Structure formats: structure tokens, C-alpha cells
Amino acid sequence: KDLTARNGKGFNRTNLTYMRKLYLAFPKCGTLSHKLTWSHYYELLKCDNALEMQFYYKESIKECWKVRELKRQMKSCLFQRLALSTDKAGVLALANEGHQVQTPQDIIRDPFVLEFAGLPKQKRYKESDLEKALKDHMEQFLLEMGRGFAFVGRQYSMQIGSRQFKVDLVFYHCILKCYVLIDLKRAEIKHGDIGQMNLYLNYFKTEVCQPDDNPPIGIVLGTRKDELLMEYALEGITNQLFVARYQLYLPKREELQAQLDKLLDEAE
């Protein structure tokens, strides 16, 4: 009451609790970024550990996330999903430097979370339904894909010999300087899907890419994948070709955090 009387509104019990948390997390006020608002810090302080908070802090500044974008990335467990694809040193680098995009592998998340598409996970849908939903929610899809992506087209047509083929989504990655082709599968990824994407990549290298472009990247997205089958299917392929899962709902944070804790404990 005394603080409110002297300084105005905003000094309720909840805000005071978060102000204390802010001081404990950032004891040196000079380390705080003026690019972030109090609402950003309010969300950051909900993180369970310092590594996670540092990651979202760095990414919010680097990517100029609005508060709603920060909240979505936290709900989708972006930190845990990226961290589980690396080792302990990678987790620490992720927290200290944010997500660095330097190689094709850096743009892969497994799973990709597409809850914004609005397709009920139990309802049957066609691949074209998912493709259209992603195009209709392109801003959210680009947020999930990460920095550097520029949308090129949907159902990109390729004439190869006497046959015509179409790849679902095509992007250009401004950091990696290459095309990124995405093929969507409604169910489990099959070994034939790998050969099909490899065909598309070979076509792009020859017919589409410019001399100063890096080799294209292919991503086959499905709801499930057999790890051993994919290992054999990808063996011997020299193109940058990846397979990853997607899900139409937000992940369970507790499960991902438990997996990450196990990874860090095993590295001790």
C-alpha cells in the first residue's frame, strides 16, 4: 500500500514477487536489455531453470519476438526440443548464445510443433489440408521453422522428362543461402519418400539453383518414422536430406524436461 501510494499502481503482491525474481535472475541491472518490455521479463521469469531462461532471453532479443511469440515458443517447449538434439556442451551453448544457424542440421526440430494449423489430431485429414493450413498460417509456421526462412511457393512444379512432379512447400534460407524443400506426409514416413525427395533435390541443384547458391536441403515431415528404416534409406545419399516428425498439438513439457534432465545427468 505504501509503494502504491508513493509510486502509483502496479505494486500488488504478484508483481512484487516477480520484481524480486527479476532482481535475483538479473542482479546487475546493466545486463537487462531495453529491447524487452516488463511483459517479456514477466514471461521469462516463469522458466524453471536458468539455462532455459537465458535461451529465451537471448532469442527474444535476437529474433525481436513479441510477447505472444515468446509465450508460444515457451509453450511449444522450443528450448527442450532443440536441446534434445545435441549434447551437454550444445545445451550450454544454446543457453548462452541462443540458437545459431550455421549448418543444415541446425534448422531441424524433431518434432516440429504445428498446433496453430487447427487440425484436430484425431480427425482424418489429407496432406493437402495440412499444406493449406500451413500456408494460411504462414507467419506462425515461419516462427516455428526459425530465423532465415523466406516462403517461395506451394506445390512447386517440376517437369522431369515426360513426367511432372510437385513438392509441397519451397522456401529459401537467407542465412544458409539455399533452397529448402518440404514434403508433408499425413502418416508414417516410408523409405520411398526418401527417394522421391532425393529426386527433387537433384532437380533443384541442376535446374533451379544459381551458381552462388549452396546445395538445397530436403525435409520430409511425417507423424511417425522408423529410425532404423530411415537410417538404411538415407545411407549413401549425398544430398542434405532430413526426416522429422511433426505433431498437431503442444508437447507435454514434463516429458521433454525429463528427457533433457536425463541427457544432462548422463553427461556428468
What label would you give each PLM region?
Residues 1-268:
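Basic, low-complexity intrinsically disordered segments
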